[in-house]
Amino acid sequence: TLQANNQSGRLFKIITIPNKMPGDIFEEKKLTIGFDPNLFTDKSLFFFFRKSKLKFKPIYQNLIDKIWERKIIKNKNKFYLLPNGAVSEKYQLKVNKISKYLKRKKSDFLFVTASENNAWLLNIRGRDTKYTPIPHSYILIDKNKNIKFFCDLKKVSSSLKRGLKKVNFFDIKDCAKILLGIEKKKFVIDDNSCSFFFKTIIDKNNKILNLQDPIYILKAIKGKREIENIKKAHIYDGVALTRYLFWLKKNFYKKNITEITASQKLLKFRKKNKKFKFLSFPTISGTGPN
């Protein structure tokens, strides 16, 4: 917030959440606000606008997309399976746990919209975002362990299909149509992540249980192999950071080192490890007033 004021305070009015919520801006006005139902949950809308008298109208075509002329082309990097040494459980065992959970809840389906949970469940990763190895996807799993995986099919390789033999792959654009074809069933959805769009579709002909996605708890319990790999990752990164600090101490007064060149040097040290894939976040590099 401090940096926002310094950089943009003259051009924009900076409002800090939670000191002031978006709904507070409109005060007592009775307005109708359009929103993209794919990008919001009804829970998030209520949280940000709970004190307002606004009405919300879903707009099913994103208006920003209509005027975005130079849109970034999405990458086509393939999804990939994690090696056996990187996981503590095969995906079939994880699916068994979900099946038992659904039977306990007397439910037919779990609809998973959090991509990181899909990655954990199937022991896969992707490169759909710059700093997090998640595959943008949805999963529909029933109590009988049948799995429908919705994604960009161009990112599904033959090796991925071989490794996930019991998973049925569908184009992500067909997800809504398939959900609309299901009737008189009981769904578990997490309204912290399931969009207004999908919740409305499911709720049309089915009963919904709003519960936390059970995968959050399951993946929080780390296995022995996962714990070992976490420790190794910290050691690998610690070695790179130690080399960088030694270099910085040696060259601090000899070279003109900027915030940018410093972060680039640290990245070079990290890349010397053959197991390095990419950063988990941009290096926070600051000096002087920053």
Regions found by a protein language model. Name each.
Residues 274-277:
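Short secondary-structure junctions
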Residues 1-271, 281:
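A composition/biophysics-driven feature that prefers long, compositionally simple stretches
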Residues 285-290:
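Short, structured beta-strand/loop micro-motifs enriched in basic residues and often containing a Trp
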